[in-house]
């Protein structure tokens, strides 16, 4: 049986019959706000009812909680530029557009100017513009607009066969008879290390929800459609079909490390997962976060506050002496016997058509990735 959503109720802010024709004011959304609008509307970000007011925004900073008390670690905000902010006021109802088309409305409760340097250091642990999350933060508008939203129109889906809302995943898990479901978040192809921890987790639960992020990522990440092909190849060849469910997570990647790990877990709870895999440097980038810092942040909260059970895994690798996948917990041999490649190194190999060793990744997966990247699919 799926867990109760975060906050106890699955939010539904969808009203496709909403009459917005009389509303003159509009805010044009960027890619991140566009995906956030829909994810709020369909309940993936429950208990959020809209973009954060200053009260919730500050509470997330100070307490890693919403002002109502629920654990929440990332600000979900609607930035506008100063010129646009001058034309808005609390009490206004404003259309939310993307590429000129109306997808929702916001009832403005609050308009406020954040201290972005403080936000960067609090959320990303740095204010360096080399960090992709920090750069994105400073590239966005300097004023935030808060208030409840109504989702009037859903976006056109890049992967319609693999796009499911929380109500749908919960129904699917029930139909499959799964009482315990482990969620796995990734923005990367699934190599043997991921396969190992997924299958280790699968030994202890009824089903695996493979939930790759397909929203906005940094420019050198593998494109989502190439990754999706590689996931399908792997699942078709190496996973039991009745124990795995593939569905995409259409959010933007924040690269906020530990705080994003908590956020990712809470969202998967809303999708119906009971467990969530937290590996090494979850949602990390570069060397900004400690290897197991994300796992440690879960320990700052009582289990019932998070509600979903984190499954913490050590860094896994192939050991040439053991002749199998292992971690430091199970392998006594030195690093010289371990097959470990960085994500940066693997991406460079793939783009040059070079095959990483089969002990690192399934050959069929590598073939799919190289072919997709060579075709320039994005």
Curated annotation (Swiss-Prot):
Keywords: ATP-binding, Nucleotide-binding, Nucleotidyltransferase, Transferase. The keyword Ribonucleoprotein does not apply. It catalyses: sulfate + ATP + H(+) = adenosine 5'-phosphosulfate + diphosphate. SUPFAM superfamilies: Nucleotidylyl transferase, PUA domain-like. CDD domains: ATPS. Pathway: Sulfur metabolism; hydrogen sulfide biosynthesis; sulfite from sulfate: step 1/3. This is Sulfate adenylyltransferase. HAMAP family: Sulf_adenylyltr. One of its GO terms (molecular function) is ATP binding. Belongs to the sulfate adenylyltransferase family. GO terms for biological process: hydrogen sulfide biosynthetic process; sulfate assimilation. Its EC number is 2.7.7.4. It comes from the Bacteria. Gene3D superfamilies: HUPs, Sulfate adenylyltransferase.
